[in-house]
Amino acid sequence: MTMTRRRRGQIGEAAAAALLADSGYRILERNYRCPLGEIDIVAAQGEEIVFIEVRTRSSQTFGTPQESVDGRKRLRLRRLAAYYLGSRGLAGRSCRFDVVAVWLDRQERVAGVEVIKGAF
């Protein structure tokens, strides 16, 4: 991953976490890593655990951010969520998957953020 891409991802994740916190989500983990991979943000909203994939884009050349979460990525996130819940003694807890789409302008400043609740 190039430095520009990594930086873009960090900007997007920071913007997403700030918006989520302002919207009543309680951030539990950022960049949760386990043997199966990584979840960008794990949060709670009420009694529900929310697994959040952050997608940051500066153009629509390759589609919208939410369109980039394909079937393969969804399956991986479901497996990661099951692992997370099991490792935290939360198996059976209600959960959902949100996608946060972050748009950057040409100067890599946040131009927009959208939360897609229950994206899959």
Swiss-Prot record:
It comes from the Bacteria. One of its GO terms (molecular function) is nucleic acid binding. InterPro entries: Restrct_endonuc-II-like (IPR011335), tRNA_endonuc-like_dom_sf (IPR011856), UPF0102_YraN-like (IPR003509). Pfam families: UPF0102 (PF02021). Belongs to the UPF0102 family. HAMAP family: UPF0102. This is UPF0102 protein Moth_0988.
